[in-house]
């Protein structure tokens, strides 16, 4: 199957897979950018030999100069111009491929970074909640300590009073502190 393209040149594409071959011999599909494949074009050279587009692009300057011997100045200019055009197409194609590849890589990195930012934001939010809970407990303990420090010392009465001794500010049972902290935290929730 042959498909027309720019410059009235033909593009050879295999019928089933839609695959083609670029000027440098790389295969491509309609989904991946590559240089526009060119119809094989032959230029007469020294002793009636001819060059394909691929040969013209891939040969060294020394080989090209040997091939150009015996051609008219106009033919030399035309052949060199065609070589330059073909090379530029190849450079443009590889640049397009590189740009698409870089874009895909950057989009992948962006998605990874967005996931990381979301994860860090979630961790930050949970740490803020934990910090608020700890702050509430701290404030409750401070308030309780102030209350105990301000309350007057009352003499102990009753049958167990002799064994307990007087109440001293600052000495409070641990269970009452925990109860106060829990009740303050539960009230705020």
UniProtKB/Swiss-Prot annotation:
Region (Basic motif): 80-103
Residues recorded as bearing N6-acetyllysine in the entry: 80, 87, 98, 103
Biological processes, Gene Ontology terms: adult behavior; in utero embryonic development; positive regulation of gene expression; positive regulation of transcription by RNA polymerase II; regulation of cell population proliferation; regulation of cellular pH; regulation of epidermal cell differentiation; regulation of transcription by RNA polymerase II
Induction / repression: Increased levels in the VMS after hypercapnic stimulation.
Modified residues (Phosphoserine): 151
Record-stated family: Belongs to the bZIP family. Maf subfamily.
Function: Since they lack a putative transactivation domain, the small Mafs behave as transcriptional repressors when they dimerize among themselves. However, they seem to serve as transcriptional activators by dimerizing with other (usually larger) basic-zipper proteins, such as NFE2, NFE2L1 and NFE2L2, and recruiting them to specific DNA-binding sites. Small Maf proteins heterodimerize with Fos and may act as competitive repressors of the NFE2L2 transcription factor. Transcription factor, component of erythroid-specific transcription factor NFE2L2.
Protein name: Transcription factor MafG
Organism per entry: Rattus norvegicus
């Amino acid at each position: 199957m042959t498909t027309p393209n720019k410059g009235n040149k033909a593009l050879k594409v295999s019928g089933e897979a839609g695959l083609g071959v670029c000027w440098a011999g790389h295969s491509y599909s309609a989904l991946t950018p590559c240089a526009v494949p060119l119809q094989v074009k032959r230029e007469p050279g020294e002793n009636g030999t001819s060059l394909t587009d691929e040969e013209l692009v891939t040969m060294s300057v020394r080989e090209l100069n040997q091939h150009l011997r015996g051609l008219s100045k106009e033919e030399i200019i035309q052949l060199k111009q065609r070589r330059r055009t073909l090379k530029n197409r190849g450079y443009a194609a590889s640049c397009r491929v590189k740009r698409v590849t870089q874009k895909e890589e950057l989009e992948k990195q962006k998605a990874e970074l967005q996931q990381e930012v979301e994860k860090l934001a979630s961790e930050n939010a949970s740490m803020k909640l934990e910090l608020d809970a700890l702050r509430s407990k701290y404030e409750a303990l401070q308030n309780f300590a102030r209350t105990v420090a301000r309350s007057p010392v009352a003499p102990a009465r009753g049958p167990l009073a002799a064994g307990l001794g007087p109440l001293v500010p600052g000495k409070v049972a641990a269970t009452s502190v925990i109860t106060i902290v829990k009740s303050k935290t539960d009230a705020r929730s």
